[in-house]
Amino acid sequence: MRMIDIIEKKRDGKSLTKEEIEFFVNGYTHGEVPDYQASSLAMAIFFQDMNDEERAALTMSMVNSGEKIDLSDINGIKVDKHSTGGVGDTTTLVLAPLVAAVGVPVAKMSGRGLGHTGGTIDKLESVKGFNVEISEKDFIKLVNDNQVAVIGQSGNLTPADKKLYALRDVTGTVNSIPLIASSIMSKKIAAGADAIVLDVKTGSGAFMKTLDDAEALAHAMVRIGNNVGRNTMAIISDMSQPLGNAIGNALELKEAIATLKGNGPKDLTELVLTLGSQMVVLAEQATSLDEARQMLIDAIKTGKALNKFKTFLSNQGGDDSIVDSPEKLPSAKYQVEFKAKKDGYITEIIANEIGVASMMLGAGRQTKEDVIDLGVGIVLNKKVGEHVEKGENILTIHTNTKEIDDILYKLDNSITIESKGEAPTLIHKIITE
């Protein structure tokens, strides 16, 4: 088999066989296929697309390129949730203990964040002593004992994807549905999930800005999952404005605690209940979405979900007293109010710009080496569709420096007030095939 033949075949719009895809992935992973041929094939895929069989073969070749996490010793159906990312996306922090409280095993592998705010691990590390560097054996035991644990991304999972991702980044082939879908799904499958719930974001703060693109990606990932024997479904949710009210690590953790107590923002609570219901049904802990939703609402009302979160924190060395005393979490020196310049309705809060402002405060990383300031960030007091009066506080900036003119300027250009406005739809579609 020759790489040039595979490139020409795809360039001409023909379908590649499983063997041809495996030949490319194995060769590229081991350095036998040079970057220039890999980038040529990536560009051919970008223009000619791939059918469902090719996408599944590419995904599984990437899964098989490295180590796989074996979660078979964990009792029950392991359901993993993946979000395509956004601003103020606190869902994992609420969802993991919530679904665990009704018997869904959550064996979560999480990373650190690059960009607007930290990843799930950065947020959890706002809790003094919390440790994700645990052995696979301890990880499995924690999930069997308490239904929920989080481990740092470890081992050599999907090396082919890491290599191909870096190449796509510099060759103009990032925005290709088959390449994005296989990249995301290979990581989830290698991490040992039996079933997968996807939260595909759309809007200004999302990777997929339009609903059509988000839908195409959701269908692609769901089909890959179902084709390789993993029950998969997707929800398309709005990210035109930040999710919830908090953007920043400790601030988002405080918001997660409030949500587990039943006092969280409406949109975050609704998204968590929607995603959680799907997870509970896929884990076969309920027979209908309505039954699953009621189980989750009860777990919040009775305090079961909150207790699960406490045990989860203390099991991994974290100080669980922060659940009852969130003021113990890292906080910023100064709080600066950002006030409305006129009366009206908020029609726009550009999610990614708010995210960038939060990163400028120190809540996120621009490079891998950056140190995150866990206490800083932004808390929205108003959301799109809500009425404000001139001089009313729209958001509060939590900062450790008074030099924030550039951030105020950015916020000024990210929020629009007009004479009428309405709240965006939170959940656009549910995709099961």
Swiss-Prot record:
Homodimer. Catalyzes phosphorolysis of the pyrimidine nucleosides uridine, thymidine and 2'-deoxyuridine with the formation of the corresponding pyrimidine base and ribose-1-phosphate. Its EC number is 2.4.2.2. Binds 1 K(+) ion per subunit. It catalyses: uridine + phosphate = alpha-D-ribose 1-phosphate + uracil; thymidine + phosphate = 2-deoxy-alpha-D-ribose 1-phosphate + thymine; 2'-deoxyuridine + phosphate = 2-deoxy-alpha-D-ribose 1-phosphate + uracil. K(+) binds at residues 88, 90, 243, 246, 255. InterPro entries: Glycosyl_Trfase_fam3 (IPR000312), Glycosyl_Trfase_fam3_N_dom (IPR017459), Glycosyl_Trfase_fam3_N_dom_sf (IPR036320), Nuc_phospho_transferase (IPR035902), PYNP-like_C_sf (IPR036566), PYNP_C (IPR013102), Pyrmidine_PPas_bac/euk (IPR018090), Pyrmidine_PPase_CS (IPR017872). Belongs to the thymidine/pyrimidine-nucleoside phosphorylase family. GO terms for molecular function: 1,4-alpha-oligoglucan phosphorylase activity; deoxyuridine phosphorylase activity; metal ion binding; thymidine phosphorylase activity; uridine phosphorylase activity. The keyword Transferase applies. Its cofactor is K(+). The lineage of its organism: Bacteria, Bacillati, Bacillota, Bacilli, Bacillales. Pfam families: Glycos_trans_3N (PF02885), Glycos_transf_3 (PF00591), PYNP_C (PF07831). It is an enzyme of class 2 (transferase). Keywords: Glycosyltransferase, Metal-binding, Potassium, Transferase. The gene is pdp. It comes from the Bacteria. One of its GO terms (biological process) is pyrimidine nucleobase metabolic process. One of its GO terms (cellular component) is cytosol. This is Pyrimidine-nucleoside phosphorylase. Phosphate binds at residues 81-83, 92, 108-110, 120. The keyword Transferase applies. Substrate binds at residues 168, 187.
